[in-house]
């Protein structure tokens, strides 16, 4: 919990900085990544980023697990969204947090899909369920608001994660179909940590 609180402070400062400076100075995917790492490092007990930060702007955000390079790096501008899939490693624990930051005014279509993804995340995170449930039996709670729009995303909704170790850690996760090669189908036990990361990805446009 302390790690999540510290990471939330860093992330809130980052979003505030982003929204107040994207139209005043040149900010790119890579420089945004450096800024968030700097803000995390200012938190007591920070050790390192949990994994390579993934900041994807505009059409890049529709490419699952896109990671910016000096060759692909683009400047952030208004009228689009920045997808940030990042995490921090602290002495108290690790985080894996995905956030979408709106810059300026966006289209009605973007608003509709952004809202659907928000509903999806909330449906799953607020769910009450009985002992003995698995991720594959609960995944539909996240997907339903997205399925209602005849959309889907081609990955699991969430995965287990460890403490200053592998950020993708078995034995559980959220996926409505079973992938035999993935050890993610164990029933939930008290104390397990699992991410909640639904999404909509419109190729060539946004995500």
Predicted regions mapped to residue ranges:
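Active-site neighborhoods and metal-handling regions in enzymes and metal-associated proteins
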Residues: 1-207
């Amino acid at each position: 919990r302390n790690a999540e609180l510290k990471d939330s402070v860093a992330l809130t400062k980052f979003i505030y900085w982003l929204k107040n400076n994207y139209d005043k100075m040149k900010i790119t995917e890579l420089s945004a990544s450096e800024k968030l790492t700097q803000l995390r490092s200012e938190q007591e007990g920070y050790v390192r980023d949990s994994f390579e930060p993934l900041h994807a702007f505009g059409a890049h955000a529709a490419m699952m697990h896109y990671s910016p390079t000096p060759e692909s790096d683009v400047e952030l501008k208004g009228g689009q969204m920045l997808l940030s899939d990042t995490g921090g490693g602290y002495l108290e624990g690790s985080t894996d947090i995905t956030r979408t930051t709106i810059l300026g005014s966006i289209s009605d279509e973007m608003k509709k899909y952004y809202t659907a993804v928000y509903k999806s995340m909330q449906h799953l995170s607020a769910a009450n369920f009985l002992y003995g449930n698995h991720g594959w039996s609960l995944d539909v709670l996240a997907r339903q608001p997205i399925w209602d729009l005849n959309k889907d995303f081609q990955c699991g909704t969430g995965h287990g994660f460890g403490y200053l170790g592998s950020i993708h850690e078995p034995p559980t996760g959220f996926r409505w179909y079973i992938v035999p090669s993935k050890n993610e189908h164990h029933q939930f036990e008290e104390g397990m940590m699992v991410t909640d990361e639904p999404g909509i990805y419109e190729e060539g446009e946004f995500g």
